Amino acid sequence: VLWTVPESEDERTDYPVSPPPPWPASVRAALWWHRSTPDASQYGPTGATLPITLAMMVDYLDSPVGPYREVLASPVLRRDLIPAMAVPFIAVDSEPSVHGGREHWKLPKVLAKFDGDVLGDFSATGARWSVATSAAPKGPELPVAGGLTFAQPIPGGAVERATARLRGKFRYARVTVAAEGSTLSRWLRPGTHHGIVITSGRMSTGASRVVSRM
């Protein structure tokens, strides 16, 4: 059983099998963040959290399962020395990627349709939800190196934790967002937010490990 919101629920289990991590990939992306809504905490993990919502649209130009697009969001961040995402909503347009997310990282991936350019106007549409972004990059292109950690709740109170490490180039951006869905409309704020665009990058998502608590 995966920790998820209704937009990422999926009863299907016969997805094509994906290779194990690490998953290296070339990426372009738009990321944005905002102060969490009053309702966001009920869709986040238990334990200490920070009231910051982090979301992103990602274009994987290549990967172990081929090219695909992705949208994901964390309603709040886990409070830690380095804050971590907890992702109850994530969708892709690759069946093997759905398998990989669910099997290797406990990420509740579902299938969706994508259109546009992540560095400009982009959209993701599922069965009963949609997210649209318009990224407006500003300022110079700068180098970036770091990682994003996600820690997914699993039965028994533990979490499954993994890190995606990135090296590439980015620009500051203002990202305008519209979201519809039974829960997305309650915690993914519409409007224009601070963000960045990854204009080019190499990313590698490593194997997850179970930790007793965060």
What would you call each of these model-derived segments?
Residues 4, 14, 49, 73, ...:
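Selective for proline/serine-rich intrinsically disordered segments
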Residues 1-70, 97, 191, 198-214:
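N-terminal domain-onset segments
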Residues 70-72, 85:
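Short, surface-exposed coil-to-beta transition loops
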Residues 29, 61-63, 77-214:
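Internal, well-folded beta-alpha domain core
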